[in-house]
Amino acid sequence: PDIPQIVSGLYNGMTTGAPLTIEFANRDTHSQDYANVMRHYRPSHADMVAYHKFNGFNDPRGGGHFSARLTVALTAAGVVAKKILPPGVTFDTRVAEIGGCTDPEGFDEVLRAAAAEQDSVGGIIECRVQGVPLGLGQPFFDSAESMIAHLLFSVPAVKGVEFGSGFA
């Protein structure tokens, strides 16, 4: 399990204003699995782009900072953010689809089949937020939707974001 260790920015249960540093030690590493990544880039991964962007000086073990391990840090940041939200802001989330399957009873089978094929599947996660203060964000580039989309696209697996009625 990923156990957080708070390194800085917290004192007596309160944030101090200093940078909040949370460390998650990864005890499940398999660096040898990435030995061929520099010669055979993985489809839909950042391996090739990282190699060229950093002139071959990137560390391919585990995908580096392009890894899905980034998700644990984003989740930790989300936990902290939820604690500082104003009262009345609520979230309702659900997994709406996995690999084309919309029946929650079938999700496990879709995931097992993908794992057996050593493949991955896409999905749709729905999040509804209520009680958001009026006037949140700024015009144009810093609108609430722009900032939320920017953050969501920081998650490596995210390929699309919908607001309101979505793409319909």
What are these regions (language model features)?
Residues 1-168:
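Generic N-terminal targeting/processing segments that precede catalytic cores or assembly contacts
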